[in-house]
Amino acid sequence: MTTAARPTFDPARGGSGRGEKDLSALSKQYSSRDLPGHTKLKYRETGQGTSDENRNRDFRKELEEREREARSGTGATSSSSGKALPSIVRKAIEANNAGGGSSAAKRSKPDAGQQQAQQAAQQQAANMDADEPLDNDSSDSDSDSDDDDAALLAELQKIKQERLQETARRESEKKQEDERIRMENILSGNPLMNYEPGTAASAAGRASGLGGDLKIKRRWDDDVVFKNCARSAPDKKTHFVNDALRSDFHKKFMDKYIK
């Protein structure tokens, strides 16, 4: 007999398993994303543009100094920026600026030999005779190339014209063929025009596959099987008699079952 329906008088109690010494303590489970990430408070530092710093700054004076440095040139700017740099770095920058200025000055003065060569080339170009005839071979080759180009252009234009004419001819032939097919469809598409044999309409109908001896039907149900089945049956004259003994049904019944 099953004991599944019996009440549990002694239920299972926790605390006897592993890690279940304190029954009052609830189990906890944390995710790595739930752990605190910022455990230190961040403070404002100098140079971040706080309200106290902006209150103590003299923006007018700073603007005037920047304008004065811009008007004075790069020297004042480099000197003002060099105040905040260490002495070694400042000396290196000044030496670099001095070397760059001297090298630029040296580059600005061209060599005497180069100047003489340039002057000689200019003099030779000026002494050249502008009326000196060019090479005959080069002129002949240029004229021949021009003639060849003209011939090629003429041939290309001729080919284009021929292609245009061919396209126009094909389009006209296609239009004529479409018109002929349309007229044939008009003549042979109507069955009322080709039901009589020996006519042009019947010939067109035979050519189109409709047949020249097509018979026109007056109704759609003329060729059904069970149409007018009782047409040949004799007509029965029905008459009404207000007497059950002299009615047709009573007479047939008496003739069939009594006689």
UniProtKB/Swiss-Prot annotation:
First and last residue of the signal peptide: none
Keyword set, alphabetical order: Coiled coil, mRNA processing, mRNA splicing
Coiled-coil region list: 150-182
GO biological process entries: mRNA cis splicing, via spliceosome; mRNA splicing, via spliceosome
Biased composition (Basic and acidic residues): 52-71, 157-182
Pfam family of the protein (one): Cwf_Cwc_15
Keyword Coiled coil part of the UniProt annotation: yes
Chain intervals with Acidic residues compositional bias: 129-150
Residue numbers spanned by region Disordered: 1-182
Molecular function as annotated in GO: RNA binding
Low complexity composition bias: residue spans: 72-82, 114-126
Keyword Coiled coil: yes
GO CC annotation: catalytic step 2 spliceosome; nucleus; precatalytic spliceosome
Domain of life: Eukaryota
Family membership noted in the UniProt record: Belongs to the CWC15 family.
PANTHER family, per the entry: CELL CYCLE CONTROL PROTEIN CWF15 (PTHR12718), SPLICEOSOME-ASSOCIATED PROTEIN CWC15 HOMOLOG (PTHR12718:SF2)
The protein's role, per its UniProt record: Involved in pre-mRNA splicing.
Protein name per its UniProtKB record: Protein CWC15 homolog
Organism for this UniProt entry: Drosophila melanogaster
Phylogenetic lineage: Eukaryota, Metazoa, Ecdysozoa, Arthropoda, Hexapoda
Gene designation per UniProt: c12.1
